[in-house]
């Protein structure tokens, strides 16, 4: 019963706290009885997971936006900055995010479901397979990367003769 209390959930296994747990509770085995009066435990557990996800999102947002948060650190590199000692470090990190994100999408989202050597696919290895949200989630990952690419204006730091890369990258999205 302790997992139904949002205050206790952060002390539990990570496997019980996030989107995968919530998806299982809402779409996994036994979810067809979720709205029935006898399934208060599952409903309470799902509520606790959703509350925990909300709390984590709020904490991340606060860390990014507070006066001494990560956004401020990123835009104010210098000797006293724990993250970025100079502009080059900040720009290097900015530029590395898309390639690292593409690797994560490939390694953690796509490869688990790609057919093995025997030719058999592994659809139940896909994130959010129970809810049929695998592909919308992957699409959202790419949409977020496209937005990041556009908003960061990273192409503007390239020499003029290399800025054509921006159009090429936009086309790929």
Annotate the PLM regions.
Residues 1-173:
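Mature extracytoplasmic or organellar-lumen-exposed domains after removal of signal/transit peptides
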């Amino acid at each position: 019963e302790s997992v139904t209390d949002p205050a206790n959930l952060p002390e539990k296994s990570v496997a019980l706290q996030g989107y995968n747990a919530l998806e299982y509770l809402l779409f996994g085995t036994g979810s067809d009885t979720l709205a029935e009066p006898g399934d208060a435990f599952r409903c309470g557990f799902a509520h606790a997971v959703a509350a925990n996800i909300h709390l984590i999102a709020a904490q991340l947002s606060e860390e990014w936006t507070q006066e001494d948060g990560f956004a401020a650190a990123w835009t104010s590199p210098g000797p006293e900055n724990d993250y970025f000692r100079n502009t080059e470090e900040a720009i290097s990190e900015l530029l590395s995010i898309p390639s690292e994100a593409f690797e994560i999408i490939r390694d953690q989202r796509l490869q688990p479901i790609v057919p093995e050597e025997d030719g058999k696919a592994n659809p139940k290895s896909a994130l959010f397979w129970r809810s049929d949200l695998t592909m919308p989630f992957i699409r959202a990952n790419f949409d977020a990367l496209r937005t990041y690419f556009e908003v960061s204006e990273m192409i503007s730091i390239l020499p003029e003769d290399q800025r054509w890369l921006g159009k090429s990258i936009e086309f790929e999205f």
